[in-house]
UniProtKB/Swiss-Prot annotation:
Residue ranges with Low complexity bias: 1251-1263
A Gene Ontology term for the protein's cellular component: THO complex part of transcription export complex
Keywords: Coiled coil, Cytoplasm, mRNA processing, mRNA splicing, mRNA transport, Nucleus, Phosphoprotein, RNA-binding, Transport
Record-linked InterPro entries: Tho2, THO_THOC2_C, THO_THOC2_N, THOC2_N
Subcellular location: Nucleus; Nucleus speckle; Cytoplasm
Lineage: Eukaryota, Metazoa, Chordata, Craniata, Vertebrata
Stated name of the protein: THO complex subunit 2
Name of the gene this protein is made from: THOC2
Coiled-coil ranges per UniProt: 293-339, 896-965, 1464-1491
Motif Nuclear localization signal, residue numbers: 923-928
Keyword Signal among UniProt keywords: no
Organism in which the protein naturally occurs: Rhinolophus ferrumequinum
Length: 1576
C-alpha cells in the first residue's frame, strides 16, 4: 500500500513501455482485491485512474496507451465503467474551469478512446451537456437541457389525477380496516404488509400517506408495539430512510401552535421508533421545539430570578409597610405562575424514560443545561421510576428492613430497557449515572430516597466487614467513591428541597454514621458551601431558610424556648447547614443567646446534630476571624462564646466528638493553643471537672477526697448526670486514639506558647494562653485518671522515662500523667495479694501494700535516674524523688471535715424533703433513697480513704531513712528538693500547692534524717521576688496557696509553745548548729527553742513584706498583679504584725491611686486586697507581742560566752564558723570591743533628741532641727543602699550541716561579736569626741581602700543608732498620740538617756554622713533590711544592759522634759556647726550620686524634676528597701507639704518597724539566692 498517498509515480510514466505499465497493472490488481466501496483501497483505485487520466490531459501519456491499459484493468472490477465515469466527470469540471484548449482537447480524445469501456447512458448521466455535444453523444446541448427539465417536472411536480370520491377513499378505508383488525391471532406483519401493497397498487394510494396512516393507527394501539415495529421495519425497506422521520417531524410541527399541546401518544410512538433505531434522534431533534438556545436562555433567566428573590429577602426592612409590600409581591408572584409552553423535547424525553430507553434519554439531557430536564417534575418522576425498576432486585435482597414487606415494582417488558441490578457492582452500570442526571430532584420521590439510603447502608456494612481479595477491595472502593458522589450531588441536595422530612433525615443518618467523620464533614462542607449555588431552586431555598432563621432568632427567649425550638427543628430537617451557620453567627455576637439556643435544639435529628458539630468546627476554623481582641491581650469574645456553646451542646445532646477533638489536636500540632479553650469547656461540661483558681478552702479540701466527695463538694456548680456524657467523651478519645496525643501535645505546647508564640504576642496574652494550656492539661488529665480503666490507662500511657526522653514531655506533666497509672497499678496489685490470703490481719495487709508498692515503683525508681544528671542523686535519692511525684493529697490526709459537711448537707436535704408537703410521695421516696445512697457512699469512701492513708504513712515511715543521702550539705539537699520537687509542683495545680506544703510537713513529722525543716522554710520565705515575677496569673494563685499552707503550719507552731514543743521540739528538722562557748571554734548541734523560733518567724514575715513592697514598687504589670494575687491568698496568715501590715497598706493604697486610670485590672486587684487587708487590721498585733525580746545578761562573761546579743540563743541558728578563723578577724574583734559601749550611749541620746525635736511642740529653733534630722534620714537611706553588698550582708550566712562555709560569709558574724563586745566598754564624753574624729579619718581611708571594712564600720554605726530610737518611740507613744498616724507600737521596758545629748549630736551626723558613701549592691537588695533590723535589735539589747530595769512613769516624764530643754539650748550651738558641715555633706552627696548606677540616676531625675534638694524624705525600711524607692517617696513628701510632722512620724515608723527581730541567728541567704536562681 505504498501508493496510498502518491498512487502513480512520475517515474512510471516516464518508463511506461519498459516498466511503468506493468507496475500500474500490478497496483490496480492489488487495489481491486477489496470490493467494498467504503474501504480506503477503493478510494486509492479511483485515485490511480484519476492520476492516469490526468497525465494524459497534461500530455505526458498518449491516450492510446491509456485506453489500452484501462481496457486491461476493466477485467479486475465489475464497477469499472461507473468508476471511470466518475473520473471523467471530475476531469470534465476541472478542464472546463481551467479553460486551457490543449487540455480540453486531450480530455476529449481520451473519452472518445474509452467509449467502448463506458456506456453512453452512464456518460449522459454524469457529464456536462456541452461535453456530451463535443463528444457527439447528443446533437444539441440546448435541446437536451429542455427535454430533461420536462421529464423532471413530469416526475416530481405533476400530481396524478385520481378519482378521490371512489377509488382512494375506499382504499384508505380498507387500509384502516386492515390495520385495525384483531392482531391476536396468527396474523403477522408480513401478511399485513402484502395486503397493504395490494391496496396501494389497487387504489393507487400514496405510499407516504399510507405510512402516515400506519403511524396514526400505531398511536391508537400502543399495546401492539412489536407488531407495528415489525410492520414499519418491513415497510421502510421499500422507502427512503428519511421519510419516516420527516412524517413524524411534520406531525410534531402541527402541534407547535401557541396553544397547541402535543399528545403523549405521539411522544410514545416517536420514543419507540427511536428505541428500535427506525429513526435517528439527530434527524428528529431538529423538528422539535423549543430550540436549544431558548432553553439556555430560560435557564439563565431562572438563575437571575432566584438571585433577585435572594436579594429581596436579604434587604433590610425598616417599616411595617414595607413588610406588607413584600407580602403582596409574594402573592403576585404566586398568581403569575402561568402554564408553561409545550416543550416537545421534554415530552419526548419523558416518553423515552417511560419505555426505558435510557441511552436516547441521556443524549437529549446532554443537550440541555445541568439538571434542567430533571427540574420538571414529570421528568424527575420518570427517572425515579426507571431507577425503581432498575434497583428492585438488589433492594429486595439487601435493603428491605426485617419484617417489612413492601410493594414490589414490576420490571419493564421491553428487552431494550436497562438491565436490573442484582449486586452492588451492577449499580455502576446505569443507576449511578441516572442519579447524576436526577440531581437534587430526587426530592420528588422520598420512597426512592429511602431505598437508595438503605442500599448504601448495606453496602457500607459489607464494605467495613469485607476481608476479600485485593481486586475485590479495589472494586468496592470504586463503588464507595460513587456512593459518596451520589450522596454529595443527589441525596443531600434532595433533602434540602424536601419539605422538612425528619424521617428522611434519620434514614440518611443510618448510612452517614457508617462513614468516617472525615467523609461526613467533607460532604457537609460541599453541601453548605457549594451545593446551594448549583441550582436556582436551591438558591431560593437558602434565602428562604436564612429569612426564616432570622425570624425565629429575633423572637427566641428563655420563655419561648419550646415553640421556638420546634420551629428550629422543623427548619433544620431540610437545611441544617444554613440554619446552624446563621445561629452560630448570632451566638458569636450575643452570648446571652447560648442558653436558650442550647435548650431549643432538642428537636433536632441525629444527622442535624452531626451537621451542627461540623458547623461549629468550621466556625472555629474561620480564617477571617481574629482570635484576639484589638488590644492583643485577651482572647476574642466570639471564641469564648463558641467554646461555652460547645461545652453546653455537646454535654446535652449525643453529638459525635471525634471531629472536634481531632481539630483541637491538629491546632496543637500547628502550634496554636487558642482552641484549647474549646476542649476545656467540653471537658468541664461533659465530665463535670472544673478548673478554677477561685476555689474555696472547703472545695479544695473536698478535692483531696474520693471521687464522690469531689463531685459533691469540690465544684461550684452541682455536677450531676455526667455519667453518659463523660462516657461519650471517653469513647470518642479511645476510639480515635486521641487521649495520650492530646495530653502530650498540651504538655509540649505549654513551652510552645512561650518560645514559639510568645515573641509575637503581648506578655499578658502569653500568660493567659499558658494558663489555659496548663489548666486544660490538668483538667484533661484528671478526666482520664477518673474515667479510664486501669488496663486502658496502662496500655496508653508509656513509662516516665519514655514520656520525658522520647516525647520530650516536661517532668511535672509526665508525672501528672503517670501518677494515676501508679495508683491504679498499686491498687490492683494490692487487691491481688489480698485475694491470695483472705482474712489476714491489718499488719499483713500493710505488708502486702508495701510489697505491691515496691513491685510497681521499683521500675520507676530506675527510670527516674535518667531524668537528671547523676550529681542530683548525691543530694536526694531516686526513691524520694519518685515518692514525692507519685503521691497526692488523697494519700497523705483524710478530709474528715469535708465528709462530715457533705453528710450533714444530705441530712438537711432529707429533712427538707420530709417537711415538703407539696412533693408527691413517689418522688419524695425516690429523693430520699437517692440521698441515703449518696450518704452511704460518702461514708464508705471516707472509711476506704482512712485505711489507704494509714497504709501510705506506714510505707513512708519505712522508706524515710533512705530518702535523703548524707553525701552533701543540708543546704544543697534542700536546694535540690526545692528545685526539682517543690517549686515545679506547687505551681502545677491548687491541690498540688497544698500537697507540697503538707509533704514538707510530713517529711518533718516523719523525723527524716538529713532534712532541715527550718532551712527549707527559710528558703521558701526568704526571697519570693524571683518566683513571683516569673509566674503566670494562675501560677501566682497556686504559689500563693502554697505559701498560705506553709504559713498556716508556721503560724500554728508560732502561736502556742506547747504545740511547738510537741511537733518541733525533738525533731531533727529544727536541729541547728551552735557556736561553741569560748573561742575554740568548735561547733555542736542543738534544738531551736520556742522564743528563737518566734524571732525566725518574724524575720520571715519581714522578708515577705520587703519582697511584696519591692514588687509593688517596680511598676511592672506582672510583678504587681502576681504579688497582689499572692498576698490575697496568704491573707489569712499574713500580715500578722501591725507595722508590717501598715507598710503594705500604704503601698497598696498608692497602687490604687496610680493604677486607677492606667490599668483598671490592677486597680481592681489592689482595691480588693486593700479592702480585705483593712478588714483584717483588727487581727494584727504589735511586734513585741509577735516575738518576745528578753533582756540579755549583764555580766561580760555571759556576753562573751553566749555571743553577741546576750542570750544563749543569739548564735543558735548562726552558721557554723570554720576552725581556722583568721588572726585579722580576731584583731578586729578585740579592737571593736573596746569602742562599742560608748557608741551605743551616744547613739541613744542622739536618737532621743531627734524624737523630742520632731514632736511639733518645740520652740522656733526646733524647725531647723527637724530639717537637720530629715537630712540625716536621707543620709541613712543612702547608707542602707550602700550596705547592700554581698560581703557585708549580715544575713549572708549558712545554716549548714557540717558548718562548712566561705570565710567571706563568716566575716559579718565575727564582726558582730566584736562590735557587741565593744559596746560594753563605757567612755567619757571627751574620749567620745576624740574617738569620733579618729573614726572619721579612718573612714575616709576605708572609703578609698577597703570597701568591705568601710561597709562593716557603717553597720556598726547603724547598730549604735537604734537603742535611742527605740526609747524615743516608747516615750513618745506614752506621752501622747501622734497627730498624723495615730498608730501605737508598744515596746517592752522604758528607756532613758543617761548621757547629755549635746556631746553626741555632732558625731551622730558625722556617722550618718559617712553612711552615705557606701556603695549599693542591687543584687542583694533583698537581704539588706534583715541585716539592719538584726543589727538594731542587738544594739538595743546591749543598751538595755546600761539602763535601769524599771523606772516609774512620772520619773520618765521628768527626765524627758529635762532632755527636751537641754536639746533646745544645744540646737542653737549646732546651727553654727551646720554651716561648716554642709559643704562636706554636699560633697559626699555628689560622690554618692556618682556611685549610683546611671539608669537609677536617670529615673531619679525623671521622677523628682527639680526637687533633688529634698533627698532626706523617706519612709521606714519596710517601705523602701530598694534604692529607687526613696526617690519615689520624695515627690510624695514634697506634694504633701507636711515636712515637719510628717517626716518625724516617718522616722518613728522606721524605728518601729526596724526594731523587731533580735540578731540571735542568721541563715545563709547568699546561698539561698544562688539556689533560687537555679531552681527558678
Amino acid at each position: 500500500m505504498a501508493a496510498a498517498t502518491v498512487v502513480l509515480p512520475v517515474e512510471w510514466i516516464k518508463n511506461w513501455e519498459k516498466s511503468g505499465r506493468g507496475e500500474f497493472l500490478h497496483l490496480c490488481r492489488i487495489l481491486s482485491e477489496n470490493k467494498n466501496h467504503d474501504s480506503s483501497t477503493y478510494r486509492d483505485f479511483q485515485q490511480a485512474l484519476y492520476e492516469l487520466s490526468y497525465h494524459v490531459i497534461k500530455g505526458n501519456l498518449k491516450h492510446e496507451q491509456a485506453s489500452n491499459v484501462l481496457n486491461d484493468i476493466s477485467e479486475f472490477r465489475e464497477d469499472m465503467p461507473s468508476i471511470l465515469a466518475d473520473v471523467f466527470c471530475i476531469l470534465d469540471i476541472e478542464t472546463n474551469c481551467l479553460e486551457e484548449k490543449s487540455k480540453r482537447d486531450y480530455f476529449t480524445q481520451l473519452v472518445l478512446a474509452c467509449l467502448y469501456l463506458v456506456s453512453d447512458t452512464v456518460l449522459k448521466e454524469r457529464l456536462d451537456p456541452e461535453t456530451l455535444e463535443s463528444l457527439g453523444l447528443i446533437k444539441q446541448s440546448q435541446q437536451f437541457n429542455q427535454k430533461s427539465v420536462k421529464i423532471k417536472t413530469k416526475l416530481f411536480y405533476k400530481q396524478q389525477k385520481f378519482n378521490l370520491l371512489r377509488e382512494e377513499n375506499e382504499g384508505y378505508a380498507k387500509l384502516i380496516a386492515e390495520l385495525g383488525q384483531d392482531l391476536s391471532g396468527n396474523i403477522t406483519s408480513d401478511l399485513i404488509l402484502e395486503n397493504i401493497k395490494s391496496l396501494i397498487g389497487c387504489f393507487n394510494l400514496d405510499p407516504n400517506r399510507v405510512l402516515d396512516v400506519i403511524l396514526e393507527v400505531f398511536e391508537c394501539r400502543p399495546e401492539h408495539d412489536d407488531f407495528f415495529i415489525s410492520l414499519l421495519e418491513s415497510y421502510m425497506s421499500m422507502c427512503e430512510p428519511q421519510t419516516l422521520c420527516h412524517i413524524l417531524g411534520f406531525k410534531f410541527k402541527f402541534y407547535q401552535e401557541p396553544n397547541g399541546e402535543t399528545p403523549s401518544s405521539l411522544y410514545r410512538v416517536a420514543a419507540v421508533l427511536l428505541q428500535f433505531n427506525l429513526i435517528d434522534l439527530d434527524d428528529l431533534y431538529v423538528h422539535l421545539l423549543p430550540a436549544d438556545n431558548c432553553i439556555m436562555d430560560e435557564h439563565k433567566r431562572e438563575i437571575v430570578e432566584a438571585k433577585q428573590i435572594v436579594r429581596k429577602l436579604t434587604m433590610v426592612v425598616l417599616s411595617s409597610e414595607k413588610i406588607d409590600e413584600r407580602e403582596k409581591e409574594k402573592e403576585k408572584e404566586e398568581e403569575k405562575v402561568e402554564k408553561p409552553p409545550d416543550n416537545q423535547k421534554l415530552g419526548l424525553l419523558e416518553a423515552l424514560l417511560k419505555i426505558g430507553d435510557w441511552q436516547h434519554a441521556q443524549n437529549i439531557m446532554d443537550q440541555m443545561p445541568p439538571y434542567y430536564a430533571a427540574s420538571h417534575k414529570l421528568i424527575a418522576l420518570a427517572i425515579c421510576k426507571l431507577i425503581h425498576i432498575t434497583i428492585e432486585p438488589l433492594y429486595r435482597r439487601v435493603g428491605v428492613p426485617k419484617g417489612a414487606k413492601g410493594s414490589p415494582v414490576n420490571a419493564l417488558q421491553n428487552k431494550r430497557a436497562p438491565k436490573q441490578a442484582e449486586s452492588f457492582e451492577d449499580l455502576r452500570r446505569d443507576v449511578f449515572n441516572m442519579f447524576c442526571y436526577l440531581g437534587p430532584h430526587l426530592s420528588h420521590d422520598p420512597i426512592l430516597f429511602a431505598k437508595v439510603v438503605r442500599i448504601g447502608k448495606s453496602f457500607m456494612k459489607e464494605f467495613q466487614s469485607d476481608g476479600s481479595k485485593q481486586e475485590d477491595k479495589e472494586k468496592t472502593e470504586v463503588i464507595l467513591s460513587c456512593l459518596l458522589s451520589i450522596t454529595d450531588q443527589v441525596l443531600l441536595p434532595s433533602l434540602s428541597l424536601m419539605d422538612c422530612n425528619a424521617c428522611m433525615s434519620e434514614e440518611l443518618w443510618g448510612m452517614f454514621k457508617t462513614f468516617p467523620y472525615q467523609h461526613r464533614y467533607r460532604l457537609y462542607g460541599q453541601w453548605k458551601n457549594e451545593t446551594y449555588n448549583s441550582h436556582p431552586l436551591l438558591v431560593k431555598v437558602k434565602a428562604q431558610t436564612i429569612d426564616r432563621a432570622k425570624y425565629i432568632m429575633k423572637r427566641l427567649t428563655k420563655e419561648n424556648v419550646k415553640p421556638s425550638g420546634r420551629q428550629i427543628g422543623k427548619l433544620s430537617h431540610s437545611n441544617p447547614t444554613i440554619l446552624f451557620d446563621y445561629i452560630l453567627s448570632q451566638i458569636q455576637k450575643y452570648d446571652n443567646l447560648i442558653t436558650p439556643v442550647v435548650d431549643s435544639l432538642k428537636y433536632l435529628t441525629s444527622l442535624n446534630y452531626d451537621v451542627l458539630a461540623y458547623c461549629i468546627i468550621e466556625a472555629l476554623a474561620n480564617p477571617e476571624k481574629e482570635r484576639m481582641k484589638h488590644d492583643d491581650t485577651t482572647i476574642s469574645s466570639w471564641l469564648q462564646s463558641l467554646a461555652s456553646f460547645c461545652g453546653a451542646v455537646f454535654r446535652k445532646y449525643p453529638i459525635d466528638l471525634a471531629g472536634l477533638l481531632q481539630y483541637v489536636a491538629n491546632q496543637l500540632k500547628a502550634g496554636k493553643s487558642f482552641d484549647l479553650l474549646i476542649l476545656k469547656e467540653v471537658v468541664q461540661k461533659m465530665a463535670g471537672i472544673e478548673i478554677t483558681e477561685e476555689m474555696t478552702m472547703e472545695q479544695l479540701e473536698a478535692m483531696t477526697g474520693g471521687e464522690q466527695l469531689k463531685a459533691e463538694g469540690g465544684y461550684f456548680g452541682q455536677i450531676r448526670n455526667t455519667k453518659k456524657s463523660s462516657q461519650r467523651l471517653k469513647d470518642a478519645l479511645l476510639d480515635h486514639d486521641l487521649a495520650l496525643p492530646l495530653c502530650l501535645l498540651m504538655a509540649q505546647q505549654r513551652n510552645g506558647v512561650i518560645f514559639q508564640e510568645g515573641g509575637e504576642k503581648h506578655l499578658k496574652l502569653v500568660g493567659k494562653l499558658y494558663d489555659q494550656c496548663h489548666d486544660t492539661l490538668v483538667q484533661f488529665g484528671g478526666f482520664l485518671a477518673s474515667n479510664l480503666s486501669t488496663e486502658d490507662y496502662i496500655k496508653r500511657v508509656p513509662s516516665i522515662d519514655v514520656l520525658c526522653n522520647e516525647f520530650h514531655t516536661p517532668h511535672d506533666a509526665a508525672f501528672f500523667l503517670s501518677r494515676p497509672m501508679y495508683a491504679h497499678h498499686i491498687s490492683s496489685k494490692y487487691d491481688e495479694l489480698k485475694k491470695s490470703e483472705k482474712g489476714s490481719k491489718q499488719q499483713h495487709k500493710v505488708h502486702k501494700y508495701i510489697t505491691s508498692c515496691e513491685m510497681v515503683m521499683a521500675p520507676v525508681h530506675e527510670a527516674v535516674v535518667s531524668l537528671h544528671v547523676s550529681k542530683v542523686w548525691d543530694d536526694i535519692s531516686p526513691q524520694f524523688y519518685a515518692t514525692f511525684w507519685s503521691l497526692t493529697m488523697y494519700d497523705l490526709a483524710v478530709p474528715h471535715t469535708s465528709y462530715e459537711r457533705e453528710v450533714n448537707k444530705l441530712k438537711v436535704q432529707m429533712k427538707a424533703i420530709d417537711d415538703n408537703q407539696e412533693m408527691p410521695p413517689n418522688k419524695k421516696k425516690k429523693e430520699k433513697e437517692r440521698c441515703t445512697a449518696l450518704q452511704d457512699k460518702l461514708l464508705e469512701e471516707e472509711k476506704k480513704q482512712m485505711e489507704h492513708v494509714q497504709r501510705v504513712l506506714q510505707r513512708l515511715k519505712l522508706e524515710k531513712d533512705n530518702w535523703l543521702l548524707a553525701k552533701s550539705t543540708k543546704n544543697e539537699t534542700i536546694t535540690k528538693f526545692l528545685q526539682l520537687c517543690i517549686f515545679p509542683r506547687c505551681i502545677f495545680s491548687a491541690i498540688d500547692a497544698v500537697y507540697c506544703a503538707r509533704f514538707v510537713e510530713l517529711v518533718h513529722q516523719q523525723k527524716t534524717p538529713n532534712f532541715s525543716t527550718l532551712l527549707c522554710y527559710d528558703r521558701v520565705f526568704s526571697d519570693i521576688i524571683y518566683t513571683v515575677a516569673s509566674c503566670t496569673e494562675n501560677e501566682a494563685s497556686r504559689y500563693g496557696r502554697f505559701l498560705c499552707c506553709m504559713l498556716e503550719t508556721v503560724t500554728r507552731w508560732h502561736s502556742d509553745r506547747a504545740t511547738y514543743e510537741k511537733e518541733c521540739g525533738n525533731y531533727p528538722g529544727f536541729l541547728t548548729i551552735l557556736r561553741a562557748t569560748g573561742f575554740d571554734g568548735g561547733n555542736k548541734a542543738d534544738q531551736l527553742d520556742y522564743e528563737n523560733f518566734r524571732h525566725v518567724v518574724h524575720k520571715w514575715h519581714y522578708k515577705l513584706t520587703k519582697a511584696s513592697v519591692h514588687c509593688l514598687e517596680t511598676g511592672e504589670y506582672t510583678h504587681i498583679r502576681n504579688i497582689l494575687i499572692v498576698l490575697t491568698k496568704i491573707l489569712p496568715w499574713y500580715p500578722k504584725v501591725l507595722n508590717l501590715g501598715q507598710a503594705l497598706e500604704r503601698r497598696v493604697h498608692k497602687i490604687c491611686q496610680e493604677e486607677k486610670e492606667k490599668r483598671p485590672d490592677l486597680y481592681a486587684l489592689a482595691m480588693g486586697y486593700f479592702g480585705q487587708l483593712k478588714s483584717r487590721k483588727s487581727y494584727m498585733i504589735p511586734e513585741n507581742e509577735f516575738h518576745h525580746k528578753d533582756p540579755p545578761p549583764r555580766n561580760a562573761a555571759a556576753s562573751v560566752q553566749n555571743g553577741p546579743g546576750g542570750g544563749p540563743s543569739s548564735s543558735a541558728i548562726g552558721s557554723a564558723s570554720k576552725s581556722d578563723e583568721s588572726s585579722t578577724e580576731e584583731t578586729d574583734k578585740s579592737r571593736e570591743r573596746s569602742q562599742c559601749g560608748v557608741k551605743a550611749v551616744n547613739k541613744a541620746s542622739s536618737a532621743t533628741l531627734k524624737g523630742n525635736s520632731s514632736n511639733g511642740n518645740s520652740s522656733s529653733n526646733s524647725s531647723k532641727t527637724v530639717k537637720e534630722n530629715d537630712k540625716e534620714k536621707g543620709k541613712e537611706k543612702e547608707k542602707e543602699k550602700k550596705e547592700k553588698t554581698p560581703a557585708t550582708t549580715p544575713e549572708a550566712r549558712i545554716l549548714g550541716k557540717d558548718g562548712k562555709e566561705k570565710p567571706k560569709e563568716e566575716r559579718p558574724n565575727k564582726d558582730e561579736k566584736a562590735r557587741e563586745t565593744k559596746e560594753r566598754t563605757p567612755k567619757s564624753d571627751k574620749e567620745k569626741e576624740k574617738f569620733k574624729k579618729e573614726e572619721k579619718v579612718k573612714d575616709e581611708k576605708f572609703k578609698t581602700t577597703v570597701p568591705n571594712v568601710e561597709s562593716k564600720s557603717t553597720q556598726e554605726k547603724e547598730r549604735e543608732k537604734e537603742p535611742s530610737r527605740e526609747r524615743d518611740i516608747a516615750k513618745e507613744m506614752k506621752s501622747k498620740e501622734n497627730v498624723k498616724g495615730g498608730e501605737k507600737t508598744p515596746v517592752s521596758g522604758s528607756l532613758k538617756s543617761p548621757v547629755p545629748r549635746s556631746d553626741i549630736a555632732e558625731p551622730e551626723r558625722e556617722q550618718k554622713r559617712r553612711k552615705i558613701d557606701t556603695h549599693p549592691s542591687p543584687s542583694h537588695s533583698s537581704t539588706v533590711k534583715d541585716s539592719l533590723i538584726e543589727l538594731k535589735e542587738s544594739s538595743a539589747k546591749l543598751y538595755l544592759n546600761h539602763t535601769p530595769p524599771s523606772l516609774s512613769k512620772s520619773k520618765e516624764r521628768e527626765m524627758d522634759k529635762k532632755d527636751l530643754d537641754k536639746s533646745r539650748e544645744r540646737s542653737r550651738e549646732r546651727e553654727k556647726k551646720d554651716e561648716k558641715d554642709r559643704k562636706e555633706r554636699k560633697r559626699d552627696h555628689s560622690n554618692n550620686d556618682r556611685e549610683v548606677p546611671p539608669d537609677l540616676t536617670k529615673r531619679r531625675k525623671e521622677e523628682n524634676g527639680t526637687m533633688g534638694v529634698s533627698k532626706h524624705k523617706s519612709e521606714s525600711p519596710c517601705e523602701s528597701p530598694y534604692p529607687n524607692e526613696k526617690d519615689k517617696e520624695k515627690n510624695k513628701s514634697k506634694s504633701s507639704g507636711k515636712e515637719k510632722g510628717g517626716d518625724s512620724f516617718k522616722s518613728e515608723k522606721m524605728d518601729k518597724i526596724s526594731s523587731g527581730g533580735k540578731k540571735l541567728f542568721s541563715l545563709n541567704l547568699s546561698s539561698t539566692h544562688k539556689s533560687s536562681d537555679k531552681h527558678r
